Swiss-Prot record:
EC number(s) given by UniProt: 6.3.2.6
Organism expressing this protein natively: Chlorobium chlorochromatii (strain CaD3)
InterPro entries per the UniProt record, alphabetical: SAICAR_synt/ADE2_N, SAICAR_synt_PurC, SAICAR_synth, SAICAR_synthetase, SAICAR_synthetase_CS
Gene designation per UniProt: purC
This protein's name: Phosphoribosylaminoimidazole-succinocarboxamide synthase
Origin: domain of life: Bacteria
Amino acid sequence: MNKKEQLYEGKAKKVFATDNPDLVIQEFKDDATAFNNKKKGTIADKGVVNNAISCKLFTLLEQHGIRTHLVEKLSEREMLCRHLDIIKAEVVVRNIAAGSLVRRYGFAEGTVLECPIVELYLKDDDLDDPLMIEAHAVALGVGTFEELAHLKQQAEVINTVLRSFFAERKLKLVDFKLEFGRHNGEILLGDEISPDTCRFWDLATNEKLDKDRFRFDLGSVEEAYSEVERRVLEL
């Protein structure tokens, strides 16, 4: 599969065309950003780690009936993916109170939620990715009510699978972000699943093992990412 012109560059990844218009190559970068690009830096080998974790988790989800954009892992930093028309919604699933949920509603950080909360955010950096209800999303042309219900249903299934997987590896899946896209009339899970897009806490100590270590200058960022990779791939 030949890597051709760059189609897109985001905060953490580049996307390249291939010989097949239905397939793209997603390349993971070491760049790190937080607070909608207001804080920038690099995390050594983050791209390698996130690609490995994402490929493993997409494969796991496929085994549980969740269709994803992953075709195969190509190299340390690259995966071959189905070319998606990305839906302009970020789907966030929350199991434990942290981050913006604490700031908005006054939860104590670490509060275990009665049931998982599934939220929709408009994917728009200029607007700081605002929280939206389904009616907003439909009015903005993000998707239909039926499509949004499907996204939430998929997110709930993904949460069930991933919580169990990470619990076996002594990690709490605090919350995580998902992105979906359309491919030949089907909605597929896209983007990545990694310490960039999830909050992971150690089950015994609640040590943060994700991008919060970069966001809040907690140190040992590379070590945290590598520890998640070790637990995902080796256990």
